[in-house]
């Protein structure tokens, strides 16, 4: 049986020959601890979190980030330099009042997302495939554009039919 594309993607990203549940949990904990350590030094929104965890089970002890946190502290949540930001998504509240939420994405974030989409979409289509994308196309780095790029990279043809486009 051939491994799922997402498994092959993770193995390639992590330089592994095989992938077990234990490998995944070890990778998750290592990456989380690296992130926690770096954010503690940045003195931003996450500065009061612990510098690392002993197990993934300790995640439940961390405070949950709320929509209000995102709306009020977007710049303090940056995990990279502002110069590295490629895409900013602004999400307005469902009501008529309240601050918009802003989420920032670096070039690396967008490339990682495309790679993940390639792994997932590659299970359903490939070279010569045609895929209709009914997602927002709000400019470079938008969800629709990232999906379209993933389809192009696996040799398919994206059919753009999302918000902001006519059918």
Model-derived segments and spans:
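Nucleotide 5′-phosphate-binding alpha/beta core
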Residues: 1-92, 98-112, 119
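AMP-binding/adenylate-forming
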Residues: 107-120, 130-167
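Short helix-loop-beta connector
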Residues: 125-129
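Short, charged low-complexity intrinsically disordered segments located at boundaries
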Residues: 62-71, 123, 141-150
């Amino acid at each position: 049986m051939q491994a799922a594309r997402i498994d092959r993607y993770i193995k390639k990203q992590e330089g592994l020959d095989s992938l077990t549940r234990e490998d995944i949990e070890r990778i998750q904990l290592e990456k989380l601890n690296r992130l926690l350590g770096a954010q503690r030094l940045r003195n931003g929104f996450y500065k009061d979190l612990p510098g690392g965890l002993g197990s993934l089970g300790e995640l439940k002890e961390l405070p949950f980030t709320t929509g209000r946190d995102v709306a009020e502290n977007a710049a303090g949540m940056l995990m990279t330099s502002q110069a590295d930001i490629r895409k900013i998504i602004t999400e307005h509240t469902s009501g008529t009042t309240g601050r918009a939420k802003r989420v920032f994405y670096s070039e690396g974030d967008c490339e990682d997302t495309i790679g993940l989409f390639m792994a997932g979409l590659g299970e359903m289509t490939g070279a010569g495939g045609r895929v209709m994308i009914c997602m927002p196309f709000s400019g470079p780095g938008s969800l629709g554009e990232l999906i379209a790029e993933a389809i192009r990279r696996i040799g398919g043809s994206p059919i753009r039919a999302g918000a902001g486009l006519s059918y």
